[in-house]
Amino acid sequence: MSESTEITESSVEAAVEAALAAIAAAGDSEALKVVRHDHTAEGSPLAQLNAGIRSLPGDRKAAAGKLVGGARGRVSQALAAKEAGIAAAEEAAQLVAEAVDVTALPNRWTSGARHPLSLLQERIADVFVGMGWQVAEGPELESEWYNFDALNFDADHPARAMQDTFFVEPAEAHLVMRTHTSPVQLRALLGDELPVYRIASGRVFRTDEFDATHLPVFHQTEGIAVDKGLTMAHLRGTLDHFVETLFGEGARVRLRPNYFPFTEPSAELDLWHPTFAGGARWIEWGGCGMVNPNVLRSAGIDPEVYSGFAFGMGVERALMFRNDVKDMRDMAEGDVRFSQQFGMVV
């Protein structure tokens, strides 16, 4: 506040009148942002008046504070009202601009578009069907036994906690919304004759945030093969063929040791993406490994006779780096304009 400016009713009222006039003149949200900065931000007349209260004698501070505070409140209320009015006007203008006359006869039929996640899941399934695998399905509402116990999850494993898993009432039913598609693999081992080569895709549910890189409901693709004599070499060869078919020539995988309850040994699956939008690089994609003998025993299979490998990865994540999708929320919000850019092929 300058030394020549005093906190008087007239100086405060002048600052308020200037702010109100600017607010009234603002024609859109961008103009209102400028007004808000000029009349309420640090360095504005009202802000200078408010800062000047500190230099007043003690017997004047209360009255001056009440005067300036009331003025700032009037300006804030006017800004809020103007902001609401502009937002309503802009929304109304958008509705008019995007209005569709449902009685008008179209000149031609518009080509439809399927959701790219559905297309990508079918593309993945086609790759494995071409290798002689079969597609498997399973329920989204799953028992704890299939989702955790039979897959070698300890009773105190963090994934069983309510902050990670959606449990379904009543509690004594021991039902959960499946947290991965691995139960489909177990059901295939229990219900099909050996050898088993199955690929499964579907929705899974976790208590994740809804943001650019996380969804509480997303899709996974998992595969399992159980036969006599299978090794990590078979797993590696299968994954190399898969990624080269899906991502193009030059794509390959890298396996890094890790731990998963249902595989032993286990590995993180990295993908070398040769056509990544930001330049070729390694990208962490999923997990894999040899099926844990305890899982085979849960399905009544002798691990001394049979061995198997399994792998899993997120479909949304694959779509993001395969097709340069920046925000995972675009896949979940149902805006047809997102799907239309893909058409019928991904």
UniProtKB/Swiss-Prot annotation:
Its main location: cytoplasm. Keywords: Aminoacyl-tRNA synthetase, ATP-binding, Cytoplasm, Ligase, Magnesium, Metal-binding, Nucleotide-binding, Protein biosynthesis. Pfam families: Phe_tRNA-synt_N, tRNA-synt_2d. The keyword ATP-binding applies. InterPro entries: aa-tRNA-synth_II, aa-tRNA-synth_II/BPL/LPL, Phe-tRNA-synth_IIc_asu, Phe-tRNA_ligase_II_N, Phe_tRNA_ligase_alpha1_bac, Phenylalanyl-tRNA_Synthase, tRNA-bd_arm. The keyword Lipid biosynthesis does not apply. It comes from the Bacteria. Its cofactor is Mg(2+). One of its GO terms (molecular function) is magnesium ion binding. Coiled coil: none annotated. Belongs to the class-II aminoacyl-tRNA synthetase family. Phe-tRNA synthetase alpha subunit type 1 subfamily. This is Phenylalanine--tRNA ligase alpha subunit. The gene is pheS.
